[in-house]
Amino acid sequence: MKKLSKVFSAFVKKPLTSETLESALNELNLLLIGNDVATETADALCEKIKESLKGEQIGRLTSKSKFLFEILRDIITEILTPERTIDLLEEIRIKNKSNNPYIICFLGVNGTGKTTTIAKIAYYLKKNNISSVAAASDTFRAAAIEQLSYHMQNIGIRVIKHEYKSDPASVAYDAVQHAKAKNINVVLVDTAGRQVSNKNLMREMQKIVRVSEPDLILFVGDSLAGNDALNQAKEFNNSVGIDAHILTKFDADAKGGAALSISYETKKPILFVGIGQGYDDLEPFDNAIFISNILDLKEE
């Protein structure tokens, strides 16, 4: 996120006047887009800055950097604020009061680290004394069941699985029934990585959702994929519906634009970010920390 921080820092320290604001915002817009901020998000951010400065005599401000910093902080806070906030642990506890498991369905394209992320979530739940079972509903990709089983065995979580090419929805259904019978708190449903253009796999995904009736649908995206991650999230949201995001490889993302764009354009919260390969390398996404990282500005 250092690159995005430098972009905002340079903007704040510019010798802005009412006459030069437009060109400065155009330059900011291009720099944002160059750092994985989607065009629509960059346009909205710059327009909000312009609106916030309307009527201000910028050149006469005695503390211009501080003033612009506060404007940016408020605007980015607004961009990152979702339509619905999710307290995962609390939602699980509420659902469990009715003696029913809380069901989480994970989706995304291949190569984003989805299966490893499921293991990280299982480990996170285990640390919070919440039991879980995994459904190996990726019956499409070779070695997918073995990969999930390997990770879950490492952390002591059972996997419900069928044969390859079997109905993925039936695997999810069996996992839910197992959780009910064994009084397990959470069902974690793995699904085949798919492109939204693959209509057969998308119909399969819709069936999994219809049969398992998840309480939470999580899109797992690669933060290094930039606008591709945003486009994938939007397409999955249109086809299936998603409730929140997990961004992987967040520790390696020098730009930080994907988080801004996904938050703004889907209006869905980022619940967690992956920060390494270990099962414990998962952190709840904190808006305030993210903002402080990309607005690491010091007044001149």
Q: What name fits each language-model region?
A:
Residues 21, 114, 140-141, 168, ...:
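Charged, low-complexity surface patches
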Residues 147, 167-182, 196-299:
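Conserved catalytic-core segment of NTP-binding enzymes
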Residues 190, 299-300:
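Short hydrophobic/aromatic patches at helix-to-coil boundaries
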Residues 110, 192-193, 222:
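Short glycine-/small-residue-rich Rossmann-like dinucleotide-binding loops
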Residues 141, 154, 191-194, 210, ...:
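Short, cationic motifs built from Arg/Lys/His that form the positively charged side of catalytic pockets
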Residues 4-137, 144-164, 173-179, 186-189:
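Primarily NTPase-proximal linker/entry elements flanking Walker-type ATP/GTP-binding cores
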Residues 1-6, 300:
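Short acidic DE-rich linear segments
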Residues 39-41, 141, 251, 279:
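Short hydrophobic/aromatic residue motifs in ordered secondary structure
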